[in-house]
């Protein structure tokens, strides 16, 4: 009986809050991975941010040993996956290392769009998908309806789905039995030349780069010289083992296993995710198919508050990119904010989390400008250029047409909220493509401009549907649109960090809202501050922050009116002079106001 038959690699697919991390905790407890004393809630969510927000961001892995009912001992390698739409690339990375996936569905809420998308990814990759109904301890659980939904919406047989409750600890053994029986064992040859796929890497201050790998063929031992295919560098393996969630050294990893490798790599880019590791003596081994590089969808300028932090900021970004392959950055300068970086993110949540991680883990103070998506511009010379920063948009005279990215959004919503969701999509300039009634739910398919989706669509969708609607979207194409750049001028000077690209129909109303909002946020000065929104040379709205002024008439009791006029005139001239030389400090909140302008 070969060792491979007793290995099962699986991951869990679930929507946010359907109980994925809690189920993982129960598996670890059942298999004795941690003693009760070390057990904490959501053991695998190791980042503080993950625990606070109750979401999983990074893929983690755990190796458990399970004594099955058939008397054999199985090695279960479980790779955790995130559930939020912004992190779907993490999911595809985790799935590439598995042969099976558990689809965890909340028995009260039913199937959500996110799980559907990830489930299709798993089925396309040829994984065995096992449905599990979680939260069966809730009084409002409806297993029959949810089973029907899984069959209707996803199309996999759910008759034998395990009924479990991770919180109450029921159905855990049944789930583990299903994994052993239904998930196929990995294929591979422990004696062939080594081929291992890097699923994830992160930087440890003491150990250098730690990589999570899945060995496809061959065996990797401590003390081996390895070759990293894309960088062609050779390294010596100093430590090798598995996570039981604690790091446990085993000295070797064989075909089919998942574990970590430390090879004293100090260069942050030494072990790129999706790369292949092989032994230095067999450099000709074919590279394994990696992952598709994810394209950032949202760009924003990120600047350190004090320019002394610029170098630390760059190092911090370097370390984060190692651990988060989808983060993209390049240096940028702004007149208003000095030196910083233009960063690309997968979505607004990703952007918030990166900013929070930078501020927490690296102790930086940052200012973020309004996020924009990438636009395509066709110039009069017939060149196509991509613009991810409104201040780099060419002069309108050179532009033949502008194209905005369009996404196809799939929305699942209960029938009661259908009207609200449709009117939200129409407000966001959406075009309905399809609509299907599935039991109590409705599946809507819309084409929407990405610029409208990434900003606040997700939050608005949740609020108009009381949290029941779920969303999944992917980029389809660029489409010509009537877009303009909206500039914000303060005392006649353009502030590059506040520029936006908007649709011409919304430009005037957006400009008005913005200037009103800025008026509240810019503190009063000793002179009037004019805040204007302009499209090209045309001013579409204006507000004024009134000057603070001393009461110069206080000393005139009674007295002649001409005396009062003279004093007021003198004050006016003083203010006028001051305005020519004065500069206005723009507070951090003002840059964020651009994001939070409600329609």
Curated annotation (Swiss-Prot):
It catalyses: GTP + H2O = GDP + phosphate + H(+). It is an enzyme of class 3 (hydrolase). GTP binds at residues 17-22, 134-137. It comes from the Bacteria. GO terms for biological process: positive regulation of translation. Its EC number is 3.6.5.n1. InterPro entries: EF-4 (IPR006297), EFG_III/V (IPR035647), EFG_V-like (IPR000640), EFTu-like_2 (IPR004161), G_TR_CS (IPR031157), LepA_C_sf (IPR038363), LepA_CTD (IPR013842), LepA_IV (IPR035654). GO terms for cellular component: plasma membrane. It is a peripheral membrane protein. PROSITE patterns: G_TR_1, G_TR_2. SUPFAM superfamilies: EF-G C-terminal domain-like, P-loop containing nucleoside triphosphate hydrolases, Translation proteins. Residues 5-187 form the tr-type G domain. It is found in: Cell inner membrane. GO terms for molecular function: GTP binding; GTPase activity; guanosine tetraphosphate binding; ribosome binding; translation elongation factor activity. HAMAP family: LepA. Belongs to the TRAFAC class translation factor GTPase superfamily. Classic translation factor GTPase family. LepA subfamily. Required for accurate and efficient protein synthesis under certain stress conditions. May act as a fidelity factor of the translation reaction, by catalyzing a one-codon backward translocation of tRNAs on improperly translocated ribosomes. Back-translocation proceeds from a post-translocation (POST) complex to a pre-translocation (PRE) complex, thus giving elongation factor G a second chance to translocate the tRNAs correctly. Binds to ribosomes in a GTP-dependent manner. This is Elongation factor 4. The gene is lepA.
């Amino acid at each position: 009986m070969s060792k491979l038959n007793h290995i099962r690699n699986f991951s869990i697919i679930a929507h946010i809050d359907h109980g994925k991390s809690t189920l993982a905790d129960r598996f670890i407890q059942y298999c004795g991975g941690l003693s009760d004393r070390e057990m904490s809630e959501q053991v695998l969510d190791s980042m503080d941010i993950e625990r606070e927000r109750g979401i999983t961001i990074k893929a983690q892995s755990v190796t458990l040993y399970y004594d099955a009912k058939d008397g054999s001992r199985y090695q279960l390698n479980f790779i955790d996956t995130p559930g939020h739409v912004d992190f779907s690339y993490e999911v595809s990375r985790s799935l590439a290392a598995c042969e099976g996936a558990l689809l965890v569905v909340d028995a009260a809420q039913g199937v959500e769009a996110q799980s559907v998308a990830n489930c299709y990814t798993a089925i396309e990759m040829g994984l065995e998908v096992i449905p599990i109904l979680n939260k069966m301890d809730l009084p409002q659980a409806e297993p029959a309806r949810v089973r029907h939904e899984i069959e209707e919406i996803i199309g996999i047989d759910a008759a034998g789905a395990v009924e479990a409750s991770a919180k109450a600890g029921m159905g855990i053994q049944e789930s583990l039995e299903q994994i052993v029986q239904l998930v196929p064992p990995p294929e591979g040859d422990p004696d062939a030349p080594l081929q291992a796929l890097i699923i994830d890497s992160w930087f440890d201050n003491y150990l250098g780069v730690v990589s999570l790998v899945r060995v496809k063929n061959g065996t990797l031992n401590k003390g081996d010289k390895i070759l990293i295919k894309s960088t062609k560098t050779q390294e010596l393996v100093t430590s090798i083992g598995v996570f039981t969630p604690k790091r446990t050294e085993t000295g070797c990893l064989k075909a089919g296993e998942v574990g970590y490798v430390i090879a004293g790599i100090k260069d942050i880019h030494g072990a790129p995710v999706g790369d292949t590791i092989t032994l230095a003596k067999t450099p000709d081994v074919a590279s394994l198919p990696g992952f598709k590089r994810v394209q950032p969808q949202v760009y924003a300028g990120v600047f350190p508050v004090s320019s002394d932090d610029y170098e630390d900021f760059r190092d911090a970004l370097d370390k984060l990119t190692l651990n988060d392959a989808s983060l993209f950055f390049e240096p940028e300068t702004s007149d208003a904010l000095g030196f910083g970086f233009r960063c690309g993110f997968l979505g607004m949540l990703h952007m918030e989390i990166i900013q929070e991680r930078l501020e927490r883990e690296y102790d930086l103070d940052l200012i973020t400008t309004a996020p924009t998506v990438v636009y395509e511009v066709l110039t009069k010379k017939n060149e196509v250029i991509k613009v991810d920063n409104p201040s780099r948009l060419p002069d309108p005279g050179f532009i033949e047409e502008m194209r905005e990215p369009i996404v196809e959004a799939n929305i699942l919503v209960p029938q009661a909220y259908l009207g609200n969701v449709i009117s939200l999509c129409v407000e966001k300039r959406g075009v309905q493509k399809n609509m299907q009634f599935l039991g109590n739910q409705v599946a809507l398919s819309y084409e929407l401009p990405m610029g409208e989706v990434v900003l606040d669509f997700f939050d608005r969708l949740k609020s108009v549907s009381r949290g029941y609607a779920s969303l999944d979207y992917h980029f389809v194409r660029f489409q010509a649109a009537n877009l303009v750049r909206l500039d914000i001028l303060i005392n006649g000077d353009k502030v590059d960090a506040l520029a936006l690209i908007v649709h011409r129909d919304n430009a005037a109303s957006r400009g008005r809202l913005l200037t009103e909002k800025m008026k509240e946020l810019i503190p009063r000065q000793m002179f009037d501050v004019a805040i204007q929104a302009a499209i090209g040379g045309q001013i579409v709205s204006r507000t004024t922050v009134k000057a603070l002024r001393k009461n110069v008439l206080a000393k005139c009791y009674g007295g002649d009116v001409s005396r009062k006029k003279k004093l007021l005139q003198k004050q006016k001239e003083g203010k006028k002079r001051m305005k020519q030389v004065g500069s206005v400090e723009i507070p951090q909140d003002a840059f964020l106001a651009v994001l939070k302008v409600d329609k």
